[in-house]
Amino acid sequence: MPTITSYFGFLLAALTITSALFIGLSKIGLI
């Protein structure tokens, strides 16, 4: 099922980007 696969792929990408932004902000010291 390509729809479910693409959905999980998008979800994984969004989670990765969110984690990267959170880590970046933490290193800068805003959080």
UniProtKB/Swiss-Prot annotation:
SUPFAM superfamilies linked to this entry: PetL subunit of the cytochrome b6f complex (SSF103436)
GO biological process terms held by the UniProt record: photosynthesis
Subcellular location as annotated: Plastid, Chloroplast thylakoid membrane
Keyword line: Chloroplast, Electron transport, Membrane, Photosynthesis, Plastid, Thylakoid, Transmembrane, Transmembrane helix, Transport
Membrane topology: Single-pass membrane protein
Superkingdom, natural source: Eukaryota
Main localisation: plastid
Pfam families recorded: PetL
Segments passing through the bilayer: 4-24
PANTHER family, per the entry: CYTOCHROME B6-F COMPLEX SUBUNIT 6 (PTHR37266:SF1)
Described function: Component of the cytochrome b6-f complex, which mediates electron transfer between photosystem II (PSII) and photosystem I (PSI), cyclic electron flow around PSI, and state transitions. PetL is important for photoautotrophic growth as well as for electron transfer efficiency and stability of the cytochrome b6-f complex.
Family: Belongs to the PetL family.
Protein name: Cytochrome b6-f complex subunit 6
Species annotation: Citrus sinensis
